[in-house]
Regions:
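Core pore-forming/fusogenic effector modules of secreted, proteolytically activated toxins
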Residues: 1-60, 88-165
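Polybasic, Ser/Thr-rich amphipathic helices
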Residues: 62-91
Length: 165
């Protein structure tokens, strides 16, 4: 089996990401009282940073075995893709990395109304080509695995409110 030597990403100097917004959850909240009703939300609850490696030759994933498969991946910081020490496992399976923002917000439902509350999450989505360099520890033979890294990283949230009655 081969071991990972290093990985190189090809398009980090470009603004090669885009922002995408997804509805995370939506619910109806009635308020039959004569005062505002406080509704506490955790917008990032069950939100993850999703990462997936695709190889041009998927069978090459098996060259690496199951141990020591950690590589660094880029993320978006200050509006640019850059390396910042974030480590993930090099695998063909989609990974859901914890997103540790526990922020809570309070939404007030006005008296005698019913509102639909929708939590929208904005993600930084990007794809970048990579070359992973591996070496056989006994023979010194080198292999290069080319592919694409896909990443969907939470960036912001928005709350929409619609009066139903």
């Amino acid at each position: 089996l081969y071991v990972i030597d290093h990985i190189t990403y090809y398009s980090l100097d470009e603004d090669s990401y885009e922002k995408r917004i997804e509805a995370k959850r939506s619910f109806v909240q009635p308020n039959g009282w004569g005062i505002d009703y406080p509704c506490l939300l955790s917008p990032y609850e069950n939100v993850y940073h999703e990462v997936m490696f695709r190889s041009d030759m998927p069978e090459l994933f098996q060259l690496l075995g199951e141990s020591n498969l950690t590589v660094e991946i880029p993320s978006v910081e200050n509006g640019h893709l850059q390396m910042n020490g974030k480590q993930v496992r090099y695998t063909s399976k989609q990974q859901t990395l914890p997103f540790s923002n526990t922020e809570q917000i309070e939404v007030s439902i006005p008296p005698y109304t019913t509102q639909r509350i929708t939590v929208l999450i904005e993600y930084y989505w990007f794809e970048t080509r990579y070359a992973l360099y591996a070496v056989h520890p006994k023979t010194g033979k080198r292999r290069t695995i080319n592919g694409t890294l896909q990443s969907k990283m939470p960036a912001a949230y928005y709350i929409t409110r619609e009066n139903i009655k």
